[in-house]
Structure formats: structure tokens, C-alpha cells
UniProtKB/Swiss-Prot annotation:
Xref: PROSITE patterns: FE2OG_OXY
Protein name: PKHD-type hydroxylase Pnap_2559
Annotated source species: Polaromonas naphthalenivorans (strain CJ2)
Domain of life: Bacteria
Entry's Gene Ontology BP terms: DNA damage response; intracellular iron ion homeostasis
GO molecular function, one term: L-ascorbic acid binding
SMART domains: P4Hc
CC cofactor note: Binds 1 Fe(2+) ion per subunit.
Residues reported to bind 2-oxoglutarate: 170
Cofactors named for this entry: Fe(2+); L-ascorbate
Keywords, alphabetical: Dioxygenase, Iron, Metal-binding, Oxidoreductase, Vitamin C
Length: 227
């Protein structure tokens, strides 16, 4: 399931994030890639322990905490701490790859299974040319280039790339989620059921049917979830 989360970050958050990034200590992004991905990765990334990274991580986590749609779609169990990257100049693309299935959290014994990938765009599409996040799925190739503050969720199993940036710089935050429900098809069904229950309640209030369907939702979640 590919899903857009509009306005995850506020204009004030974005202004503060870009001010931090203007003086940030960018490093070669290949240092954090797997063996296969490092061969096609050519971007810059912030160290995980720098001030700008920690501040933007806090902004993103606050935005996620305030997004019921994120929780409905992702059903998060664990999350890899958000990272920040930049594309432009001589470090301007990331070729086709699939993310590592398991990521080790820095300075922690924790491991995160990468069921879902998330990218949060930190500057507007007009600031740069190219830089589309291109995701291959069963419906064909999806190209994603969203306004600043918007985010996209997509399956971690997807073959994807970032197209070359030919003007300006593309700034983004990215991370992975281990879901309570491992299968993308199952998460999609639960999300669609949850969203339609919400619409039914908005239109008709609580009824015997919405109560019964809510029970169905939770019984499916109980059947599929791994805690």
C-alpha cells in the first residue's frame, strides 16, 4: 500500500528544519547502506548523533504522534530512528535497490524489521528538478514528489530509487517501521476497514452495524498481529 500523509510537519517545523540543515555536517550517505545498495547510492546524509538530526527526529515523531491515519495504516510496533538525507550537486541519486530487511538501531541492541518505508519531504518540489522517489509495485512504476511537510508510506519490500537531481537540492527524512501486522495485504484490509468505519460513524453515528464491524476489525487484528 502506497499512502500519502499530508502536512505531517507544520510550516514552523519546516522553517526550523531548513535553518538547521543549512549549517549541518553532511557526510557520504554510502556509509549506512548495505553491500548491494552502497553500489548505487550517491547522496549525503547527516550523522545520527548531530544536533540537527536529533531536532528533526523530534519534529517528525511529534507529527507522527498526531496522525491517526499513520497509526491506522502502519500499525507501528517499532520504528528505526529517522535519518536525514540530501541530494544535489555531485551526490544526486540513489539507484534501484530494496532496503535491508533488518536494520540495527545505532547504539542499541534493538533490531527493526523494515515492513514499511517512510519518506518525509523537507523542501518543496520547486526547489529542485528531478529527485522523484520512484517505487515499483504490481500496478507499475509510481513517481512521488510531494510538497514540503508531506510524507509517503510504502512497503519495505519495494524496489525503489531516487531519480537524479539536476538542479538545486532535495532534502528529506526517511525511516522504517516494523508493523504489528507483517503482511502489506493484511494491513491494507485493516486500514480500509478502519477508514470506512470512521466514515460510517461520521454519517450515521454509532449503530449496531458499526459496533459489529468494529468487533470484526479487532478480531482480524487479533488474528494477524504479532506483539
Amino acid at each position: 500500500m502506497l499512502l500519502t500523509l499530508p502536512n505531517l510537519l507544520s510550516p514552523a517545523d519546516l522553517l526550523a528544519a531548513r535553518a538547521l540543515l543549512s549549517a549541518a555536517p553532511w557526510a557520504d550517505g554510502r556509509a549506512t547502506a548495505g553491500i548491494q545498495a552502497a553500489q548505487v547510492k550517491n547522496n549525503e546524509q547527516l550523522p545520527s548523533d548531530c544536533e540537527a538530526t536529533r531536532a528533526i527526529q523530534a519534529m517528525v515523531m511529534k507529527g507522527l504522534d498526531g496522525s491517526p491515519v499513520f497509526f491506522s495504516a502502519a500499525l507501528p510496533k517499532k520504528m528505526f530512528p529517522p535519518r536525514i538525507n540530501r541530494y544535489g550537486g555531485d551526490s544526486n541519486f540513489y539507484g534501484n535497490h530494496v532496503d535491508n530487511a533488518i536494520r540495527a538501531v545505532p547504539n542499541s541492541p534493538q533490531r527493526v524489521r523494515t515492513d514499511i518505508s517512510c519518506t518525509v519531504f523537507l523542501n518543496d518540489p520547486g526547489d529542485y528538478d528531478g529527485g522523484e522517489l520512484t517505487i515499483a509495485d504490481t500496478y507499475g512504476e509510481q513517481r512521488v514528489k510531494l510538497p514540503a511537510g508531506h510524507a509517503v508510506l510504502y512497503p519495505g519490500t519495494s524496489l525503489h530509487q531516487v531519480r537524479p537531481v539536476t538542479r538545486g537540492h532535495r532534502l528529506a527524512c526517511f525511516f522504517w517501521i516494523e508493523s504489528l501486522v507483517r503482511g502489506d495485504d493484511q494491513r491494507r484490509l485493516l486500514y480500509e476497514l478502519d477508514m470506512n468505519l470512521l466514515r460510517l460513524r461520521e454519517r450515521h453515528g454509532e449503530t449496531a452495524e458499526t459496533t459489529a464491524l468494529t468487533g470484526t476489525y479487532h478480531n482480524l487484528l487479533r488474528m494477524w498481529a504479532d506483539t
